[in-house]
Swiss-Prot record:
InterPro entries: Photo_II_D1/D2_sf, Photo_RC_L, Photo_RC_L/M, Photo_RC_L/M_CS. One of its GO terms (biological process) is photosynthetic electron transport in photosystem II. This is Reaction center protein L chain. It comes from Pararhodospirillum photometricum. One of its GO terms (molecular function) is electron transporter, transferring electrons within the cyclic electron transport pathway of photosynthesis activity. SUPFAM superfamilies: Bacterial photosystem II reaction centre, L and M subunits. Fe cation binds at residues 170, 210. The reaction center is a membrane-bound complex that mediates the initial photochemical event in the electron transfer process of photosynthesis. GO terms for cellular component: plasma membrane light-harvesting complex; plasma membrane-derived chromatophore membrane.
Length: 255
């Protein structure tokens, strides 16, 4: 069904459902904006229901829009991943792309479904809006005193930064060998490998860097999801207090 192309884009069944979910979600956001106090793109806010509604359905303008938009977003993301599966199978490729994308979906679900379910109310979900979302992040940080002390957050941020560094190095080495000076020949992979062996003593290779990149990216998404799921459902105190175990550690050098 819908097995055709529009220009270079493959449509497919899940392409159609992706467009339907996306269109409905955008329409609901515009509806919430039209009924709200402002059209300022920075201040548009689609808030989750009040905590008093628990895990039930809320009235449209009291969080119901947020619930419907969330359903549309989940449907759109899942259909997009299934579209990637469909295209990969047609081309005889592996399913590495939808597999990696599924970790991004998991990170989103952690914010708007998994954590609210564990805490017993949809009101614990993240709002939709630029400034409102930043305020929500800030409030979560203050709620746990110093969120940067969250060990899962530390691991996630480490993977994010390492991913940026790895692919910054990868992209720059590709550009450097393919853009030689005037009168010089284009260099090959042997020059790439030699450069990194000279600089850091080891070259992971052209295939290895992409395997590493996938690992770093999905690890960053996974641990970012874990860090927010832990905060509230499994740990309610300030995150600096979690590290008190180190003070009682037999081989601690502190104190």
């Amino acid at each position: 069904m819908f097995d055709f192309w529009v220009g270079p884009f493959y449509v497919g069944f899940f392409g159609v459902t992706t467009c339907l979910f996306a269109s409905l979600g955008i329409a609901l956001i515009l509806l919430g904006t039209a009924l709200g106090p402002t059209w300022n793109p920075l201040r548009i806010n689609i808030a989750p229901p009040d905590l008093s509604y628990g895990l039930g359905f809320a009235p449209l303008m009291k969080g119901g829009l947020w619930q419907l938009i969330t359903i549309c977003a989940i449907g759109r993301f899942c259909c997009w991943a299934l579209r990637q599966v469909e295209i990969a199978r047609k081309l005889g490729m592996g399913l590495h792309i939808p597999f990696a994308f599924s970790f991004a979906i998991f990170a989103y679900l952690a914010l708007v479904v998994i954590r609210p379910l564990l805490l017993g109310a949809w009101g614990h979900g993240x709002p939709y809006g630029i400034l409102s979302h930043l305020d929500w992040v800030s409030n979560i940080g203050y709620q746990f005193l110093h969120f940067h002390y969250n060990p899962a957050h530390m691991i996630g941020i480490t993977f994010f930064f390492t991913n940026c560094m790895a692919f910054g190095m990868h992209g720059s080495i590709i550009l450097s060998v393919l853009n030689p000076g005037k009168g010089e020949k284009v260099k090959g992979s042997e020059h790439e490998n030699t450069f990194f062996r000279d600089v850091v003593g080891y070259s992971i290779g052209t295939l290895g860097i992409h395997r590493l990149g996938v690992f770093l990216a999905i690890s960053a998404a996974f641990w970012s999801a874990v860090c927010i799921i832990l905060s509230g459902p499994f740990w309610t105190r300030g995150w600096p207090e979690w590290w008190n175990w180190w003070l009682q550690f037999p081989y601690s050098f502190v104190g």
